[in-house]
């Protein structure tokens, strides 16, 4: 190869990027030698560029024998021969010897023979090689740095573009000459390539090469770059379909003719820049096209046969820099092949563009029948992919959860309970299971479908269920019920072979069917008989036997499904077991055990039987078609019934819906059979009905005789009685005889005397003894307390004393009894006693000691437990009180003392500790309730006896009435304990279900207290209760109505109580599981244990977050949720191992550095509680029960990295950084300053060209230095809108708001943990909005007040100086001396100013009229606004100041515009224009229009008077009343006014609740009277009645003083007389207008316009004429002025502010208007115009436009 030139060392040649760059340039095709050598010298400065050595080295390379080298070397040499022949003459001489050396050494560096040839050089060349190697390495380092910054990419593309242009020009010249020769040599391989869509002719690429020779190896491959061994031939023009269009691409691989037949060689030809641009356009858009990206890249690389270098070249064009950076570090090293690189880039895209998942749509996906399981899963795959952007194979757990949760609830529960390991199964394994359970569900749904039919008395038809009797539902509050058994006729059995002398009906010999004596006595619905015992009719379903009759196994064979009565009676005697279940509803008379009676009750012809109801014998119609028993209120004989409040609408015999009222349980008797039922009462029914409910309860059998009689057969009845004959029967009385009588409390006031030393009570040091006087007690309460205090004194519980202390007592009457109990208010004593540590365990901890194996329970209630512990004499003085002049004190622990529970519990524990080893059962003690739980009955009885004997010996008293002895179901601590677990008491369920919607605060508290005790049974108690608790904090008038959200929460809590599950008793020997979740404001969890392979709940735990926790990111909120749930669960697990299931990496969050979002104390609590050794955290791989139970969960997020997500969410934007951005668009410095009570903010910008700083923003303001810093940073963000910016600040507060705390405060509503607003919350909220405006932003913290010459130091100093100057930027007031100078720069007049400056003189570019300046039109508004100033000067002041220096024709109009748009002036200025007052329309007659109002007359009853005034005549009606409510108003109208004066047309009143109540409005609506309500807060709207109120009170006071009467009601008639007789302004009195004559008084006895001697007709005619004249006189005096129309809807107004912080508030948009009132947006009531101030734009159309329209 030659030794005249040095060779780069092999280590340098291994740089594949440089090598590939050289090859792309070297083999471009048509570049001159000089340009190639210049480019090579630029890339490799150590290589010589003598072109003369090119021919020598090329010739040496061609002459090397191929058989003397290896196979790889032969491939290279063969390629060089091809290139030499293809590039004849000048083209061949362009390749340098060093290029050939690099090519050979770079591609065959593993070949030892070739390496030795290249290293044989002269000794002088070796020294040069050493130097060149060092320089070459340095050059490579610089090249790598340049490649990282991507600076050389644009230059290389430009070079390639120029080369391509030169190549195209050269080829166009030779096309005609070579075309014919090419067709002759290569007729098959020559292809015509059309011009591509990027405008470049590429047809010469395949034809520009001359034929060359090759060896037997046509697939040339040199380092995977020069040729492609994968494809021997690649078409030069490929068409790729994209969105229906054809795009043609040229290849980076070219086919060159070899000259040996049709063989071609593939030579690499890099992508052109224009081709790369086209490929970038065709690439799927990011991030939407990430799912199609891998397929598109693979297809493109396969078509072009690209290698790793081509992938990198294409990646630089289509992928952003962050994606390429991520792709380079995914596997920690370079990808092994092209496919690996493609996969790396796709993975990097998914990391850089995280999928935005619509989890709401995914969670809402549900199964839609009749889909199969396979169709359902396929549909789920489509929904999951479309809404998450992920294939389900990449998110298996969320997809499986989505599929399982979308199934019907019953199918989901069956799937999870029947397959505990379902979460570990795959989708193909789950599909058969889902199909199985879906099939089961469809079959169950088909069974329960029923045909509707309206039944009588509206009760569902009960069905017979095997031998268990009638089973069905009972009526609810629904108005109608329509159910029917879906009966199908049973198939008739074949007649079989019946002997000729045998009856076909009864199968008895001796007669035939027609003469069968049993036919007329057939029972109804027996066998296959038809209705009424007739054969062949529609058959009834065979009904089973009564529950207490057990037929033999062969009864069907024996009787063939048919029986008559005699057979049934005989069989009953054989089948009777002697006893029947205790739950049997029949209450039989007590007879000897074992006896039985069968009763036949013969009905009358009217199908009636005699029934005794509450000792009243009545006839009742037997109706088997009636569902319910009904008592008729209109019958001849009606029994006494106690009715309830339950009422339904039922369909009776009349086929019309009739109301029925439910009666309380009533005892009825038929013959000797007694039963308790709850009949329904119909007051309009004339007969009594004995329905199917009572007949089925008595097991009655109805049959019909041949003569038409109907017989009711009552089966045998038996007694229920307790006996000790069986093993499981306990005689309680005999068992309790073994205990002494002093153990039992005989009276409610009986107390025990515990054998413990008296208790000494210590008080705090320097505490003053309270002495609170007893307020007087009413006589009835005093007499009610006297027996109680006397009894307590006789027992020594109370003693008389003289004490410095005294506290009051309160008598409380017992519900339903004429007795009182005493409440002693000891709060003052509780405040002075020394504190004690409470040792009373919670009910939850007490019950946690029970084991699931304990099935027998005994509950012992200690009577008056506190009173059994004595108090030392030295401490008794503390509890003194006064009663009837005597002072008493307690000698025992009193109720209400803060330490009574603790002291009693300590004494009881000490007492029971003595028998600790004598009892093997579990003992639970809570205050005075003792529970004994045992595994078996005998142990329980034995330990109970030991306990009771010990209590008797220790001086306790036990309540025998409350004793629950040896039962499997007991009531303890308000819960029902059973072997299965804990249940809610049925009485509590009934109380909750019947609880009406609360309308007062007290009712809400009562409801929350009722359901709050059962919160462990309610999965989402805290979520639902918070809506009701919000109402407690509101200051709302009672009664109120709950909103829709509160009603929904109320109903959900009721439903949760009524459908509560059974909670199992925790087993300490088994591990616990805690499934956790959380909503936005509450934590949710369920504590479970596995029993018999099933996960069963122990308790549902929920708790509300505080303000801090509510604003945390989801992952940290999960930590808070688990911590709260664990705190509640500790009372159950008691230190046992616990497995916590969660979807968050809790341990990772706690073990990393402490987050700035959580305080150190809170984080320490989390670490101490959540990192305990007995806790195990498990990632949920299945659907958490907490998620299934919780319907309000808002935190469902896909799988994620908790640390990364917390870091991302804690900032206002994900790309926010604190590191400088390279080459930003702007570099800003912000700073704030505060001094002498004033603040200022400034922003300066760095100019890199001149390296200086300019001020781009300055503003005064800021109540503190922190506020000024926030304003400065917000201004900097606003100035960098849509730009990349680096913002430097020296404020740690502003930096922390942006990076650490601001986003967290925004999430929790800018409040502290105490609920108070955060300081500067408005500025922080504004800053968080502004920081979203830049395209990319980095906020960097720098040190303040440092010295140096760096850009950061100088920029911060400039910002600090600008902020200090901004403090003193104030609004200057224009003065005469500087008026002209201040406007020199803006005095630019336009064409519109010509008409305003007419006649003015121009001086120095300013128009003057005398000494006054005529400003330009555009300046006028700014000048007047400045004069308006901070103090908001009025129009006269503005005009006066303006006229001193300026003049303009539009000045007054502009001032009006400024004042009309100034919000502050509109709020505080008085109303500028008085309004013409309106009047009421003239009524048509007297008492057609009334005004009413309440007025308070005194403080004693009757306190109020209802004043009613006739608007036409002013006739007053004043009625005293005790209350001012709606019922009083309705009573007076209906009993006094309307009967006396008739129905009015209209009634007016204010909007008091007594007038707006529903009863008042419905009353007037029903009688056709219009009730008009006046505008609130405007007494003049009710002026007539308001003036009457004032007159009335004044006259009452004067009359009382004149007549010396104390009661105002006594002088009211005289006042009414005077008011009705006094003439008004028209000269007529109300009496004259109404009666047609003056009222006769002492002074007017002889005055009358009528004559007594007239006839009746004449008198009436005169009276009519006189009334008409009076009425016309009233009409003439009535105001007739008309009011202008009201403001137009759509205009704006201000409303009077009642809070007086400003005179007016608003503005408000007017929606509707009348001449006197308006309806505005946001206010529910009409507003009188006296309370409105219309904006000027609403009154004058000339002032309604913008400024430019106003002044044009």
From Swiss-Prot:
Cofactor(s) recorded in Swiss-Prot or TrEMBL: Mg(2+)
GO CC annotation terms, alphabetical: host cell plasma membrane; membrane; viral nucleocapsid
Residue stretches making up the Reverse transcriptase domain: 793-977
Lineage: Viruses, Riboviria, Pararnavirae, Artverviricota, Revtraviricetes
Keyword Magnesium part of the UniProt annotation: yes
Designated name of the protein: Gag-Pol polyprotein
Reactions accelerated catalytically: DNA(n) + a 2'-deoxyribonucleoside 5'-triphosphate = DNA(n+1) + diphosphate; Endonucleolytic cleavage to 5'-phosphomonoester
Keyword Nuclease: yes
Cofactor note: Binds 2 magnesium ions for reverse transcriptase polymerase activity. Binds 2 magnesium ions for ribonuclease H (RNase H) activity.
Catalytic site positions: 623
InterPro entries with a match to the protein in the record: DNA/RNA_pol_sf, Integrase_cat-core, MLVIN_C, Peptidase_aspartic_dom_sf, Retropepsins, Retrovirus_Pol_polyprotein, Rev_trsase/Diguanyl_cyclase, RNaseH-like_sf
Note: This protein is translated as a gag-pol fusion protein by episodic readthrough of the gag protein termination codon. Readthrough of the terminator codon TAG occurs between the codons for 582-Ala and 584-Asp. The nucleocapsid protein p14 released from Pol polyprotein (NC-pol) is a few amino acids longer than the nucleocapsid protein p14 released from Gag polyprotein (NC-gag).
Region feature (Disordered): 168-222
Organism, as annotated: Walleye dermal sarcoma virus
Domain spans labelled Peptidase A2: 618-694
Modifications the protein undergoes after translation, according to the UniProt entry: Specific enzymatic cleavages by the viral protease yield mature proteins. The protease is released by autocatalytic cleavage. The polyprotein is cleaved during and after budding, this process is termed maturation.
Domain Integrase catalytic, chain residue ranges per copy: 1482-1638
């Amino acid at each position: 190869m030659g030794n005249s030139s040095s060779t780069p060392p092999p280590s340098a040649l291994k740089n594949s990027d440089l090598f590939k760059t050289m090859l792309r340039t070297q083999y471009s095709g048509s570049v001159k030698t000089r340009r190639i050598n210049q480019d090579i010298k630029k890339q490799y400065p150590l290589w010589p560029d003598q072109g003369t050595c090119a021919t020598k080295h090329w010739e040496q390379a061609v002459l090397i024998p191929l058989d003397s080298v290896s196979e790889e070397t032969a491939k290279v040499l063969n390629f060089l021969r091809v290139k030499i022949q293809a590039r004849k003459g000048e083209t061949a001489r362009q390749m340098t010897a060093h290029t050939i050396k690099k090519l050979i050494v770079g591609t065959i560096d593993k070949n030892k023979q070739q390496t030795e040839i290249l290293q044989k050089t002269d000794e002088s060349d070796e020294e040069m090689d050493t130097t060149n190697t060092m320089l070459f390495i340095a050059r490579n380092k610089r090249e790598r740095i340049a490649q990282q910054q991507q600076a050389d990419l644009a230059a290389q593309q430009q070079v390639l573009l120029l080369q391509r242009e030169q190549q195209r020009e050269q080829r166009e010249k030779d096309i005609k000459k070579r075309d014919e020769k090419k067709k002759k040599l290569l007729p098959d391989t020559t292809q015509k390539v059309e011009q591509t869509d990027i405008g470049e002719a590429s047809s010469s690429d395949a034809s520009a090469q001359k034929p060359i020779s090759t060896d037997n190896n046509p697939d040339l491959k040199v380092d995977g770059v020069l040729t492609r061994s994968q494809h021997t031939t690649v078409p030069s023009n490929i068409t790729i379909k994209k969105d229906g269009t054809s795009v043609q691409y040229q290849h980076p691989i070219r086919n060159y003719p070899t000259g040996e037949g049709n063989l071609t060689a593939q030579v690499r030809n890099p992508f052109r820049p224009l081709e790369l641009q086209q490929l970038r356009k065709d690439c799927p858009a990011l991030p939407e096209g990430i799912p199609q990206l891998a397929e598109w890249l693979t297809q493109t690389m396969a078509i072009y046969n690209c290698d790793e270098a081509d992938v990198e070249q294409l990646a630089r064009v289509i992928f952003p820099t962050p994606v390429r950076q991520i792709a380079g570090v995914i596997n920690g090293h370079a990808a092994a092949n092209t496919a690996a690189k493609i996969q790396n880039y796709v993975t990097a895209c998914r990391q850089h563009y995280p999928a935005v998942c619509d989890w709401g749509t995914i969670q809402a996906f549900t199964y839609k029948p009749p889909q199969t399981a396979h169709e359902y899963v396929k549909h789920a795959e489509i929904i999951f992919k479309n809404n998450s952007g992920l294939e389900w194979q990449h998110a298996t757990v969320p997809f499986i959860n989505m599929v399982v949760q979308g199934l019907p609830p019953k199918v989901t529960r069956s799937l999870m309970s029947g397959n505990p390991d379902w979460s570990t199964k795959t989708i193909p394994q789950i599909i058969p299971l889902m199909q199985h359970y879906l099939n089961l569900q469809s079959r169950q749904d088909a069974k329960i479908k029923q045909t509707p039919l309206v039944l009588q008395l509206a009760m569902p038809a009960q069905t017979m269920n095997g031998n268990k009797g009638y089973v069905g539902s009972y009526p609810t509050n629904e108005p109608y019920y329509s159910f029917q058994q879906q009966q199908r006729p049973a198939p008739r059995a074949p007649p079989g072979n019946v002997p000729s002398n045998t009856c076909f009906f009864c199968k008895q010999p001796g007669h035939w069917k027609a003469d069968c004596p049993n036919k007329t006595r057939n029972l109804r619905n027996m066998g296959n008989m038809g209705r009424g015992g007739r054969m062949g009719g529609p058959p009834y379903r065979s009904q089973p036997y009564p529950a207490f009759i057990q037929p033999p196994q062969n009864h069907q064979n024996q009787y063939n499904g048919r029986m008559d009565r005699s057979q049934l009676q005989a069989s009953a005697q054989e089948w009777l077991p002697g006893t029947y279940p205790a739950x049997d509803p029949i209450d039989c008379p007590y007879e000897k055990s074992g006896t039985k009676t069968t009763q036949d009750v013969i009905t009358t012809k009217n199908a009636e039987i005699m029934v005794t109801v509450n000792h009243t014998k009545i006839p009742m119609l037997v109706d088997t078609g009636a569902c319910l028993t009904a008592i008729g209120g209109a019958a001849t004989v009606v029994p006494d019934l106690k009715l309830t409040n339950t009422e339904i609408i039922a369909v009776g015999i009349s086929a019309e819906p009739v109301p029925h009222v439910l009666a309380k349980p009533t005892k009825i008797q038929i013959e000797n059979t007694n039963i308790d039922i709850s009949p329904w009462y119909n007051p309009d029914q004339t007969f009594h009905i004995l329905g199917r409910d009572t007949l089925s309860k008595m097991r009655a059998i109805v049959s019909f005789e041949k003569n038409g009689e109907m017989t009711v057969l009552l089966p045998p009845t038996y007694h229920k009685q307790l006996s000790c004959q069986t093993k499981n029967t306990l005689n309680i009385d005999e068992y309790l005889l073994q205990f002494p009588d002093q153990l039992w409390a005989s009276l409610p006031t009986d107390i025990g005397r515990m054998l413990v030393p008296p208790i000494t009570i210590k008080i705090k040091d320097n505490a003053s003894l309270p002495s609170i006087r007893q307020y007087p007690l009413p006589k009835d309460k005093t007499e009610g307390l006297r027996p109680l205090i006397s009894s307590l004194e006789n027992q020594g519980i109370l003693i008389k004393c003289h004490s410095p202390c005294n506290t009051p007592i309160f008598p409380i009457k017992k519900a339903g009894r004429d007795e009182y109990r005493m409440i002693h208010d000891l709060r003052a004593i509780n405040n002075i006693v020394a504190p004690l540590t409470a040792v009373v365990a919670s009910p939850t901890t007490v019950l946690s000691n029970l084991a699931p194996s304990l099935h027998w329970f005994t509950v012992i209630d200690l009577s008056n437990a506190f009173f059994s512990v004595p108090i030392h004499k030295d401490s008794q003085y503390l509890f003194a009180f006064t009663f009837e002049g005597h002072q008493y004190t307690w000698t025992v622990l009193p109720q209400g003392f803060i330490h009574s529970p603790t002291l009693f519990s300590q004494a009881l524990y000490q007492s029971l500790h003595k028998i600790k080893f004598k009892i093997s059962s579990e003992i639970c003690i809570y205050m005075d309730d003792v529970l004994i739980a045992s595994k078996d009955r005998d142990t329980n009885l034995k330990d109970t006896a030991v306990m009771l004997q010990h209590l008797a010996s220790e001086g306790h008293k036990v309540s025998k009435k409350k004793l629950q002895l040896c039962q499997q179901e007991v009531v303890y601590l308000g819960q029902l304990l059973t072997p299965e677990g804990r249940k809610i008491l049925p009485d509590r369920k009934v109380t909750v279900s019947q609880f009406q919607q609360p309308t007062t605060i007290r009712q809400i508290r009562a409801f929350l207290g009722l359901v709050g005790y059962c919160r462990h049974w309610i999965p989402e108690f805290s979520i639902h209760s918070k809506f009701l608790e919000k109402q407690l904090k509101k200051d709302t008038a009672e009664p109120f109505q709950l909103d829709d959200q509160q009603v929904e929460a109320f109903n959900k809590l009721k439903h949760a109580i009524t459908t509560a599950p059974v909670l199992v008793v925790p087993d300490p020997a088994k591990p616990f599981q805690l499934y956790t979740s959380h909503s936005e404001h509450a934590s949710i969890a369920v504590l479970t244990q596995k029993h018999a392979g099933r996960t069963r709940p122990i308790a549902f735990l929920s708790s509300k977050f505080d303000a801090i926790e509510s604003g945390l990111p989801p992952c940290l909120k999960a930590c808070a949720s688990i911590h709260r749930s664990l705190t509640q669960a500790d009372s159950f697990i008691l230190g046992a191992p616990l497995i916590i299931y969660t979807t968050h990496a809790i341990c990772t969050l706690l073990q990393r550095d402490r987050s700035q979002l959580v305080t150190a104390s809170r984080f320490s609590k989390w670490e101490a509680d959540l990192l305990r050794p007995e806790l195990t955290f498990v990632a949920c791989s299945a659907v958490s029960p907490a998620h299934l139970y919780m319907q309000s969960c808002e935190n469902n997020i896909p799988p994620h990295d908790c640390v990364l997500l917390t870091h991302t969410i804690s900032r206002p934007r994900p790309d926010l950084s604190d590191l400088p951005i390279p080459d930003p668009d702007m570099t800003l410095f912000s700073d704030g300053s505060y001094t002498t009570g004033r603040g200022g903010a400034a922003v300066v910008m760095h100019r890199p060209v001149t390296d200086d700083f300019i001020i781009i923003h300055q503003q005064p303001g800021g109540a503190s230095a922190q506020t000024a810093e926030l304003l400065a940073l917000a201004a900097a963000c606003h100035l960098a809108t849509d730009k990349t910016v680096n913002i430097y600040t020296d404020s740690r507060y502003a930096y922390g708001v942006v990076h650490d705390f601001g986003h967290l405060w925004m999430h929790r509503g800018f409040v502290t943990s105490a609920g108070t607003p955060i300081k500067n919350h408005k500025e922080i909220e504004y800053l968080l909005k502004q920081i979203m405006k830049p395209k990319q932003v980095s906020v960097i913290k720098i040190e303040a007040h440092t010295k140096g010459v760096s850009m950061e130091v100088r920029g911060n100093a400039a910002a600090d100086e600008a902020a200090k100057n901004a403090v003193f930027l104030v609004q200057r007031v224009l003065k005469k001396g500087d008026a002209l100078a201040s406007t020199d720069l803006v005095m630019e007049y336009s064409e519109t100013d010509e008409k305003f400056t007419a006649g003015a003189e121009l001086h120095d570019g300013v128009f003057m009229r005398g000494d006054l300046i005529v400003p330009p039109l555009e300046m006028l508004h700014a000048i007047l606004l400045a004069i308006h100033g901070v103090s908001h000067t009025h129009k006269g002041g503005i005009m006066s100041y303006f006229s001193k220096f300026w003049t303009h024709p539009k000045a007054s109009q502009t001032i009006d515009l400024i004042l009309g748009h100034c919000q502050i002036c509109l709020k505080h200025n008085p109303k500028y224009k008085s309004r013409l007052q309106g009047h009421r329309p003239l009524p048509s007659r007297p008492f057609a229009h009334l005004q009413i109002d309440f007025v308070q007359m005194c403080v004693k009853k009757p306190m109020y008077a209802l004043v009613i005034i006739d608007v036409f005549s002013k006739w007053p009606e004043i009625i005293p009343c005790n209350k001012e409510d709606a019922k009083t108003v309705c009573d007076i109208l209906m009993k006094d006014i309307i009967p006396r004066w008739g129905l009015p047309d209209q009634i007016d009143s204010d909007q008091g609740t007594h007038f707006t109540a529903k009863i008042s409005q419905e009353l007037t609506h029903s009688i056709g009277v219009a009730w008009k309500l006046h505008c609130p807060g405007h007494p003049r709207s009710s002026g007539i009645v308001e003036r009457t109120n004032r007159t009335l009170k004044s006259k009452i006071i004067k009359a009382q003083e004149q007549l010396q009467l104390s009661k105002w009601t006594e002088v009211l008639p005289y006042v009414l007389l005077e008011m009705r007789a006094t003439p008004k302004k028209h000269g007529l009195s109300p009496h004259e207008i109404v009666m047609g004559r003056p009222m006769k008084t002492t002074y007017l006895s002889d005055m009358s316009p009528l004559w007594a001697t007239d006839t009746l007709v004449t008198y009436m005619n005169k009276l009519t004429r006189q009334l008409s004249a009076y009425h016309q006189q009233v009409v003439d005096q009535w105001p007739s002025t008309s009011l202008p129309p009201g403001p137009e809807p759509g205009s704006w107004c201000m409303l009077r502010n009642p809070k007086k912080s400003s005179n007016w508030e608003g503005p408000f948009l007017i929606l509707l208007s009348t001449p006197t009132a308006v309806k505005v947006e946001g206010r529910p009531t009409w507003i009188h115009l006296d309370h409105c101030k219309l904006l000027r734009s609403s009154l004058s159309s000339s002032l309604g436009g913008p400024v430019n329209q106003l002044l044009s």
